[in-house]
From Swiss-Prot:
This is ATP-binding cassette sub-family A member 6. Its main location: Golgi. Keywords: ATP-binding, Glycoprotein, Golgi apparatus, Membrane, Nucleotide-binding, Repeat, Translocase, Transmembrane, Transmembrane helix, Transport. It comes from Mus musculus. ATP 2 binds at residues 1320-1327. Widely expressed with higher expression in heart, lung, brain, spleen and testis.
């Protein structure tokens, strides 16, 4: 092991470097991340600069005149109830000078009063008497009276001709005049003393107004809303990256030594830097464009910076709690908007200070509160400076403190829940771990405590378990005792491991074998510390795996290669290795050397600078293995480390492990039995979670009666029965395994090798009796695995079961596949189109139904949309109270003993009488008002802005004259002062009662209530319209899963794909739109009378708007969806576009042409456009007091029609995109009118050189086949001169893009009834060739022709054929079951429902999928998933089958089932199969011919035996010695007996040689010599086999690795080629 020193600082620096590299290389993502806040900032600055920064200069005092000057002749005053007192009061009112000509009407009830008011708009006022001293005035909302306590933003307006202030409306519109007349009437009725002249002579005066910035309330709300969303892009990408990295890599990195603090520090520091920079930008924008004029840069920057930090912290917290990137984004967005909108109450000054500080625990609320305070100070032209004598600076310091506290709190909670919540690894801390650090994992440790009696359990029977060699006694490195593991499934607990007892030894390679789902990965995950066992214990070098401290020590010595690949796609191979080397704690000075050593030993030097995302699956697997071995860990836990690797790479890894066997513990799982046979010293076989047997290959093969495979090739003259009798005579226990017309295969027992010399000597003499040739090979562990899988009790049972299973499976498959052509009937083109539309619609419904996360996201977004509605209701409720409020003195004036607070001041009384006014002052004091009295000569009341109001008393005693002076910021000052004066006069007349007055603002229609939330219903629709990316971007996930390619190849029409999705998406979306419409209506937020015409127009428009937005989203998905789905980001973009459009339309004068233009240019504005027109028209009727016309105008109809024009346009655009950039269709699309295209053969850029003679012959045959007019003579697949180049990466921005050649002038064809195997190492071009043949990738040059099925649908004149395709990636939907997949593809391929049932049933029977039929794909084991993908490819009656590594990940029995299915396909001589595989045993078992590709070229082609004879005529000899010290002696003896023997692998106790045929033949002499060596040197065993196809491929693969074949094409072709694009 390397010396390790794990430091958080080193890990943090490494992770920071990784993040920066990712940001730099993902330039589009980074540009989007930075551009959104920059655009928001520039928009706010430009908006403010152009139109909104108009400062109102100082307004001098204004004399409004006396009340006598008001002319109320046009007024209609209605009062209730009618009584003697009320009639007297109202009669007195008529004597007021202002009331001359006023009609006064008495009605019995409030309802009657409302009705009279409605019929006398606009000059109607209502009076409701509660008693003789209490009444309320009911006025129309349009009357213009202020209805808020305080206008925070624009209390006065500069109209150029004169200044106008809001509070003057009370005086000028007659409200105060009527109030004063009624007060005078009450006083006269009560005291029989007339004060009408005295009160009506009161003058009204406005104090002077200081300069201020007038802004509409909505301006600041929109400004704050933009500020709240300013960091949205950073939050989006932070949550996405952190959540995905935690899910994919963090736990594996923790196994390798990663500290939690390093992980969070790296992401935290990078985004602290980002927030810092972007906060500087927005602070500069806000201050330089004077959005905020009086507050400095530092305050704005600090406020934004701390708010951004809090959002990053809450993002980390939500990422830990929710563990889903999209859900995290939406919750943070909801959190921001909700609490930010609640913070608007601070802007309205509706919350008590204590509650405001309590709610500041939510950072968006605290931020909105801080912005509101800045706005208040700016409004008063004070600004926030430090220090500030007024104390406002300390309030901002408190806001800064609470934001910093919020950030710290969220971060602490994130780290806490990261410790205690179960995610990824099952090890977690106790909830109160911070109280006692030693208590961490106590529960787990106790539960899995080592039980002494388990340390030495009763060993299983020796019949199944080979005894351990004495040399390994005492070297037990890992001791597993009674390990059990259970998982919670939907149907109950699933037992993965059932009481395993096992020891793993040092200096020994141990392989874990078993079928898919046997428990191999569960065991390895437990040993690595990722999983916690349900019961039992594990010790590693006497350290308990369940103890936290021991686990940390164990992990320092562990290297883990999980089943999934672990790498960072944005990093190169070298950078990945460097990163993990630093995480593991390798000393900085040793990192480079360690990385170079790994690159060299695993032969990755040629791909060291390639990005991981551009590697093939095999190369990614090799990189993951390299990461596991960094630091030379003493314990290697490898879960299928060589899956997907080519033979050469596999041999490299085998050699690597063999060299490190000494003093190391190597435990690996595999589905590749040959790998276990060759590499592992000891095999452990697990079945259904239980241990079946352990031992070496020799033990297992001997135990289960397996040995050599003798293959005899004969002609028609050979008597097979006589030959069998001959063999049984020499080898009595020989068994016939397989028999064909040309070949017999026997199994010769391993213990009979002593009889082989005589047997082969006699067999050589038998060759003249029809025996053409023979070959011998050693049995593999495949046979052992197949026998052990069924758990029979005896060897005889093994033989019977093996024969029965093979015959039954083959019979089932032979019945299943031909039946497909029998049940398929021709259907018409349109019938097939309808079937496909229904199938895709059902697929979309199933995806929506099963994806609970998607539904939760939509519901959450709906909640965000309805959030302002809730706030609107709350605001309306508050306004209902305020609109019915009483004009009390405590609104503006202090009471005796009350400390100055809020808006209240003392009442200033100016004495201008030159006498004592003590009687009046006493009357005021009896109203509980704090007075401040001064003389007129000393104090100018109009300049006393520190007071809310003042009363100037003039005249003489007992005949006072009054002037009411009001601060223009106190909107309700005049009614209050008039009541104060009236009550003062009443008290001076020796009456103790006080007059009380309330105001009730009456709305005659359902109108939008101004609450500070701009057009709530429009906001709802804006958010709903922005939801289309969350609804209609399903195609992006199909593309990511490669499911769309599979559907297209299966014959799906492009139009059926889009229309099938649209049927569901439009229905769902239109339902949401209509719901939001009618929710707004029923919430009484719309000024619209819902007549039948309007309801119809709304429904039509909603359907059209839903269709246009859905198809617009489809276009966006097609163009931009090939990288990431980004539905949340697109929703934000939609929302911003709608908001900006509405802002431009709504803030100007109403213009129908502008609305139409906006609707045409912005499809998502269509629904809002009609709403704006209808609302504004109704509002115009309202303010002009006209009768509402309910009909639809031409503009309304045009607005309803525009979305349908958009829909047709987007469908046409989608059709054009499919035609130009889409995949080539199999059938002619009846709707899009897209026909299969014959690609013109482009000239090949290079000519073939130094080709093998068989390759040249194949090229000529392919050329002749293309020109053959006879269709019956044509092969089923013709690939002529295929050439493919991909664009490489730029080394830097100024360099030219390189061209990488994947396939170089390859020609071959597949005949009817033939299986052609396409073989070669990783990067040889196999998959690229298959994708070109399948039509997924367009060839750079060359031509492909496939056989067409004459009875298939829609092929008249088509140049493309329908075929079955099994891609390398499983293009499946995780939430769909196996049965649903099969039914979907059956419909797409045109099978009628009843036929599909039959076909599916037979295929399920043949491939043993009964138990998985109703299981979702995400719950299937890897083997079952791969099997399903294969079944989908053979479903239907396709003449061509193209299979790209179809058996990858399958266990042995699964592979055999797939092989039998493929053989059944070609049993019909009209069909052909092209097969790509890394499993050379599969190629030998299935392929009639094999084509081997190396470096993009076809190296050789021909029958398997031909290739063996041509390239691999040698034999392989393996000898296993008991005593290692005898190796040199044995080696010399072998060289003496076989002079040309070449030693191959140098492995512990295993000698491997390659022997030429001349040294081996005759076999009788070879076996005679080997028997002598076996007995002379006491060998454990030996085997002699003819060179396999594996060896042939291995030798040819070296050409690619060594660079002897490939040439330079701007770069080394030995490097991995870029992954192919799906674009044609």
């Amino acid at each position: 092991m390397k010396e390790l020193s794990v430091h958080v600082r080193q890990q943090t620096r490494a992770l920071l470097h990784k993040i920066l590299l990712k940001k730099w290389r993902r330039k589009r993502e980074s540009l989007l991340e930075w551009s959104i806040p920059i655009i928001i900032g520039l928009h706010m600055g430009l908006f403010s600069y152009l139109a909104r920064n108009i400062q109102v200069l100082e307004v001098p005092p204004q004399d409004l005149g006396s009340l006598n000057e008001f002319n109320g002749s046009s007024l209609v005053v209605v009062y209730t109830p009618i009584s003697n007192i009320t009639q007297q009061i109202m009669n007195k009112t008529t004597f007021a000078p202002t009331m001359k000509g006023t009609r006064i009407i008495g009605v019995p009830s409030i309802e009657d009063l409302d009705e009279v008011l409605l019929h006398n708009i606009p000059d109607a006022l209502g009076v409701i008497f509660n008693d003789s001293f209490s009444y309320q005035l009911k006025v129309l909302r349009m009357y213009g009276n202020p209805f808020l306590k305080e206008d925070l933003l624009a209390h006065c307006w500069d109209t150029h001709s004169q200044a106008f202030c809001s509070l003057s409306k009370y005086w000028e519109r007659g409200f105060v005049a009527l109030q004063t007349a009624i007060n005078a009437g009450i006083i006269e009725v009560t005291t029989n003393h007339s004060v009408m002249e005295e009160l009506m002579s009161i003058d009204g005066i406005n104090m002077k107004t200081l300069p201020f910035i007038p802004r509409d309330l909505s301006d600041y709300e929109i400004f704050i809303l933009f500020c709240l969303l300013y960091f949205s892009s950073f939050i989006y990408f932070a949550s996405s990256n952190v959540t995905k990295e935690r899910k994919q890599c963090k736990e594996v990195m923790k196994v390798m030594g990663l500290q939690d603090s390093a992980f969070w520090l790296s992401w935290g520091l990078i985004y602290v830097g980002f927030i810092f920079i972007i906060s500087i930008f927005i602070a500069i924008i806000i201050t330089s464009t004077q959005i905020i004029m009086m507050t400095g840069f530092l305050v704005i920057f600090t406020l934004f910076f701390l708010y951004g930090l809090s959002l990053i912290a809450v993002t980390f917290l939500m990422a830990v709690l929710l563990q889903k990137a999209v859900l995290t984004n939406l919750i943070v967005l909801f959190f921001t908007l909700f609490w930010g909108c609640v913070g608007f109450t601070v802007l309205h000054k509706e919350l008590p200070p204590s509650l405001e500080w309590v709610l500041s625990i939510f950072s968006p609320f605290a931020f909105t509160s801080g912005m509101a305070k800045v706005i208040f100070q700016d409004y008063n032209l004070n600004g926030v400076v430090f220090p500030d004598p007024s104390g406002e600076s300390y309030v901002m310091i408190a806001v800064f403190f609470i934001l910093a506290f919020d950030s710290l709190l969220y971060l602490v909670l994130a780290l806490y829940f990261d410790k205690i919540l179960l995610y990824g690894a099952e090890h977690r801390s106790a909830p109160l771990f911070f109280l006692n650090p030693t208590s961490c994992f106590r529960k787990t440790a106790n539960r899995n405590k080592v039980i002494e009696r388990d340390l030495d359990p009763e060993l299983p029977s020796d019949e199944y378990f080979e005894p351990v060699d004495p040399e390994y006694q005492g070297k037990e490195a890992i001791r597993i005792r009674n390990i059990k593991k259970e998982y919670k499934g939907k149907s109950g607990k699933v037992k993965a491991l059932k009481g395993l007892f096992l020891d793993i030894y040092e200096s020994q390679i141990t392989a874990i074998l078993g079928h898919s789902g046997a428990g191999k990965s569960s065991l390895l995950n437990i040993l690595s510390g990722l999983y916690v066992p349900t019961a039992g214990s594990v010790t590693v070098y006497n350290k308990n795996l369940s103890d936290m401290q021991d686990l940390k020590e164990i992990r320092k010595a562990i290297g883990v290669c999980p089943q999934h690949n672990v790498q960072f796609d944005a990093l190169t191979v070298k950078e990945n290795l460097t990163l993990f080397a630093k995480i593991k704690g390798i000393l900085p000075q040793d990192v480079e050397q360690e990385v170079q050593q790994i690159l060299s030993e695993l032969d990755m030097q040629n791909i060291r600078d390639d990005l991981a995302e551009h590697l093939s699956e095999g190369q990614k697997r090799k990189l993951t293995f390299g990461i596991a071995t960094v630091g030379d860990p003493q314990i290697l836990l490898l879960d299928e480390p060589t899956v997907g690797l080519d033979p050469f790479s596999r041999q490299r890894i085998w050699g690597f492990l063999k060299e490190r066997r000494a003093d190391h513990v190597i435990l690996f799982s595999t589905q590749f039995m040959d790998e276990a046979d060759i590499l592992a010293d000891r095999k452990v076989l697990i079945a259904n979670g239980a241990l079946k047997c352990t031992g070496s290959s020799v033990f297992l093969k001997r135990k289960w009666g397996l040995g050599y495979h003798l293959s005899l090739f004969m002609d028609e003259t050979c008597d097979s029965e006589r030959l069998t009798s001959f063999i049984n005579h020499h080898i009595p226990y020989a068994k016939l395994k397989a028999k064909t017309k040309e070949k017999l295969v026997y199994i010769l027992p391993l213990e009979r090798t002593s009889e082989f010399p005589e047997f082969f000597s006699d067999l050589d003499k038998y060759s003249g009796q029809g025996l053409m040739s023979y070959e011998v090979s050693m049995s593999t562990l495949n046979d052992v695995f197949l026998n052990l899988e069924g758990e029979p009790s005896t060897k005889q049972d093994f033989e019977k079961r093996e024969t029965a299973t093979d015959s039954e499976s083959l019979n089932d498959m032979e019945v299943a596949y031909p039946s497909l052509s029998q049940v398929q009937e021709t259907v018409s083109t349109m019938s097939l189109w309808r079937m496909q539309v229904c199938a895709i619609a059902r697929l979309r419904i199933l995806k929506l139904k099963r994806e609970r996360k998607a539904f939760l996201i939509i519901l959450l977004l709906l909640g965000i949309a309805l959030l302002p509605l809730v706030i609107e209701y709350v605001a309306n409720a508050l306004l209902e109270v305020k609109n019915n409020w009483e004009f009390k003195t405590d609104l503006y004036f202090l009471s005796p003993g009350q400390l100055p607070q809020g808006l209240r001041t003392s009442l200033l009384v100016i004495n201008n009488t030159e006498s004592n006014i003590e009687d009046f002052l006493q009357s005021l004091k009896h109203q509980n008002i704090v007075l401040e009295v001064d003389d007129f000569e000393n104090r100018n009341a109009t300049n006393s802005l520190s007071y809310n109001g003042a009363i100037i008393v003039s005249g003489r005693q007992k005949d006072y004259r009054f002037s009411a002076v009001c601060n223009t910021k106190r909107l309700h000052c005049f009614p209050i002062l008039m009541n104060v004066i009236s009550n003062g006069i009443l008290h001076m007349l020796n009456h103790t009662q006080y007059i009380r007055i309330k105001e009730d603002i009456f709305s005659p229609f359902i109108v939008l209530v101004w609450t500070g939330i701009q057009e709530t219903c429009l906001f709802i629709l804006c958010v709903i319209c922005s939801l289309s990316p969350h609804i209609a971007m399903s195609s992006v996930s199909d593309y990511k899963k490669k499911a769309d390619s599979q559907l297209w190849i299966s014959g799906l029409y492009p139009s059926a794909y889009w229309c099938g999705q649209a049927v569901v998406d439009i229905s769902l979306f239109s339902g949401m739109l209509l719901t939001s419409y009618f929710t707004s209506y029923t919430s009484k937020l719309l000024n619209i009378d819902m007549t039948s015409e309007i309801v119809f127009s709304v429904i039509v428009l909603a359907l059209g708007c839903a269709a246009s937005l859905v198809f617009l989203t489809y276009v966006i998905s097609f163009v931009f969806g090939k990288r990431k789905k980004n539905s949340t980001l697109w929703s934000i973009c939609f929302l911003l576009v709608i908001a900006i459009t509405f802002e431009k339309v709504a803030n100007g004068p109403f213009n129908e042409a502008l609305v139409i233009s906006a609707t045409m240019l912005v499809p998502s504005f269509a629904l809002n456009g009609l709403l704006v027109v209808l609302e504004m028209r109704a509002y115009q009727y309202y303010i002009e007091f006209e009768e509402i016309k309910h009909g639809l105008s031409a503009v309304d109809l045009l607005l309803c029609l525009i979305p349908y024009i958009h829909t047709l346009l987007f469908i046409f655009v989608l059709r054009c995109l499919e035609l130009k950039y889409g995949k080539n269709v199999v059938r002619r699309d009846p709707i899009f009118r897209i026909a299969p295209q014959s690609l013109k053969a482009q000239p090949n850029p290079e000519e073939p050189i130094d080709e093998d003679e068989n390759v040249q012959a194949e090229r000529l045959r392919t050329s002749d086949a293309l020109s053959t007019p006879n269709l019956d003579e044509k092969p089923v697949i013709i690939a002529s001169c295929l050439h493919k180049e991909y664009a490489g990466q730029k080394k830097h921005c100024c360099s030219r893009r390189t061209r990488n050649m994947a396939v170089r002038n390859v020609s071959f064809c597949v005949n009817k009834g033939e299986i052609l195997g396409l073989l070669g190492p990783d990067g040889a071009g196999k998959s690229s060739s298959i994708r070109m043949i399948a039509g997924i990738t367009k060839p750079t040059a060359g031509q492909v022709e496939l056989k067409r099925l004459s009875s298939a649908v829609g092929h008249q004149g088509d140049s493309r054929a329908e075929f079955g395709y099994c891609p390398q990636e499983n293009g499946l939907w995780p939430n769909l079951t196996v049965k649903e997949h099969l039914e979907l593809y059956a419909a797409v391929k045109g099978l009628r429902k009843e036929d599909a049932v039959v076909a599916i049933s037979r295929l399920v029977n043949a491939l043993k999928l009964h138990d998985q039929l109703n299981v979702q794909v995400q719950n299937l084991v890897a083997g079952a998933t791969r099997k399903l993908c294969f079944v989908l490819s053979i479903l239907g009656n396709s003449p061509v089958l193209i299979l790209d590594e179809p058996s990858t990940g399958l266990d042995v029995s699964g592979k055999h089932q797939v092989w039998q299915a493929i053989q059944a396909v070609v049993k019909d001589n009209e069909k052909g199969v092209l097969l790509s595989t890394h499993d050379l045993a599969e190629a030998e078992a299935l392929c009639d011919r094999a084509a081997i590709m190396v470096s993009g070229r076809l190296r050789c082609i021909g029958p398997i035996q031909h290739l063996k004879r041509k390239f691999g005529q040698d034999y392989v000899l393996e000898l296993r010695v008991k005593d290692v010290s005898q190796e040199p002696l044995v080696h010399r003896e072998i060289l003496k007996l076989f002079p040309q023997a070449a030693r191959q692998d140098r492995c512990f106790s295993l000698l491997t040689y390659k022997l030429p045929v001349t040294d081996v033949h005759p076999l009788s002499q070879a076996f005679h010599k080997l028997e002598a060596v076996k007995h002379g040197f006491d060998l454990e065993d030996y085997s002699l086999s003819q060179c396999t196809l594996d060896r042939v491929i291995l030798e040819l693969s070296k050409e690619q690795e060594l660079g002897t074949v490939y040439e330079e094409a701007d770069m080394t072709l030995g490097r991995k080629l870029l992954p192919p694009s799906d674009e044609l």
